[in-house]
């Protein structure tokens, strides 16, 4: 069975693992997922991730979740643009997440980046998810 929203699946796996206080979570690999994880790692929301080759051209991403004094670094992570309803924003209309305490992850012509980077580079794009 094919998955209709692979990025939404990864975000749900992360949310569920954080709720169960897991140290790691595994998800199928893709370039978009890896780019989103790069943004989450650079912003300090996860410790890191490794790509594990399973053979037959398949791979998995092993994500190391981050906790601080028993609390998860990610309080909320949600998908914004979905396969049935894409959400695009311009550089000027980028919304703030939690009054600037969280980030939005965007897919832009210059690559996947956080909202503050998109404002600096004056580019808009598809609003993939929000993290707080």
Curated annotation (Swiss-Prot):
One Pfam family hit: Ribosomal_S8
Annotated TM spans: none
Coiled coil ranges: none
InterPro entries: Ribosomal_uS8 (IPR000630), Ribosomal_uS8_CS (IPR047863), Ribosomal_uS8_sf (IPR035987)
GO CC terms: ribonucleoprotein complex; ribosome
GO biological process, one term: translation
The organism's place on the tree of life at top rank: Bacteria
Molecular functions (GO terms): rRNA binding; structural constituent of ribosome
UniProtKB keywords: Ribonucleoprotein, Ribosomal protein, RNA-binding, rRNA-binding
NCBIfam families per UniProt: PRK00136.1 (NF001109)
Assembly behavior: Part of the 30S ribosomal subunit. Contacts proteins S5 and S12.
Family indicated by similarity: Belongs to the universal ribosomal protein uS8 family.
Function description: One of the primary rRNA binding proteins, it binds directly to 16S rRNA central domain where it helps coordinate assembly of the platform of the 30S subunit.
Record's protein name: Small ribosomal subunit protein uS8
Native species: Bartonella tribocorum (strain CIP 105476 / IBS 506)
Lineage per the UniProt record: Bacteria, Pseudomonadati, Pseudomonadota, Alphaproteobacteria, Hyphomicrobiales
Gene: rpsH
